Amino acid sequence: MCQQILRDCILLIHHLCINRKKVSLVMLGPAYNHTMETPASFLLVGIPGLQSSHLWLAISLSAMYIIALLGNTIIVTAIWMDSTRHEPMYCFLCVLAAVDIVMASSVVPKMVSIFCSGDSSISFSACFTQMFFVHLATAVETGLLLTMAFDRYVAICKPLHYKRILTPQVMLGMSMAITIRAIIAITPLSWMVSHLPFCGSNVVVHSYCEHIALARLACADPVPSSLYSLIGSSLMVGSDVAFIAASYILILKAVFGLSSKTAQLKALSTCGSHVGVMALYYLPGMASIYAAWLGQDVVPLHTQVLLADLYVIIPATLNPIIYGMRTKQLRERIWSYLMHVLFDHSNLGS
């Protein structure tokens, strides 16, 4: 979601200031499969200019996807099976792991299929379903980062009232609110783009059905959907970042008000995992934004697409590792769970 903000702005400038036909020729190259009606399917190019490296990319993405699935599944299972881990922080982490699974599974299997076998075809409905779930997952994740920041604020600034403020009902309400907010924000965008007339090329210069890449194929002016995405993304991400920043300002103020250095370090260490996850979410998005802003003359198109591809898999791969390494209790619970599964199965087998 956050990486759409400047991309949409760039697309708006292109369509308002430059002849649209020229833009289409620059972005899409020679004409492909021109039809006069909505195509039954789209063709995903993959990473243009890196076709010779597609096999190695498929191997790397497959490895990261397996790590992401295993890591996030273990976290969800370990937290779900341990009643002592049903605290707000662990519940939000469980939801984050589930969102990461949805994000990676929406994109990576098809991407690997394109890179390995060249199976680039994706049906019209599947393409927009993929786009919906990718944007939905990113919108939910930014909301989760906000709720986790609020959790850290209450834990550090109001520790005596922690369980009274973050009750199970409050946690459920917050989780439902960020999910409903994401659905309300993303559904109109998906509807607007899917109802654009696609009477020209059906070749998507991307590895998955990304909003901007699809909007460029439309015969009608895609500015309304791009403007909606720009305003919606700005409001959602901007407000989330503002509240996260406010939470951490209050957290730092409370931490540095402690007299003991040991207490200060202990308090800050409880925020380390959350800060790491935020960095994985926002920094790759910023890199993708700046790459789009600089344009193909500075950042080649294949680099822009590669950055967008990595953005959907790297956070899902590294988030479980960050929380597993930084959270001692969770690490011990995961290790205990793995030993239980491995040794109990081996004992049953013998």
From Swiss-Prot:
Classification via Pfam families: 7tm_4
Protein name, per record: Olfactory receptor 52I2
Membrane topology: Multi-pass membrane protein
Job of this protein: Odorant receptor.
Glycosylated position list: N33
Signal peptide (from-to): none
InterPro entries in the cross-refs: GPCR_Rhodpsn (IPR000276), GPCR_Rhodpsn_7TM (IPR017452), Olfact_rcpt (IPR000725), OR51/52/56-like (IPR050402)
Predominant subcellular localization, coarse grouping: membrane
Regions of this protein lying in the Cytoplasmic compartment: 77-84, 151-169, 248-267, 326-350
TM ranges: 56-76, 85-105, 130-150, 170-190, 227-247, 268-288, 305-325
Any one Gene Ontology cellular component term annotated for this protein: plasma membrane
Residue ranges that the UniProt entry lists as topological domain Extracellular: 1-55, 106-129, 191-226, 289-304
Entry keyword Calcium: no
GO molecular function: G protein-coupled receptor activity; olfactory receptor activity
UniProt keyword annotation of Cell membrane present: yes
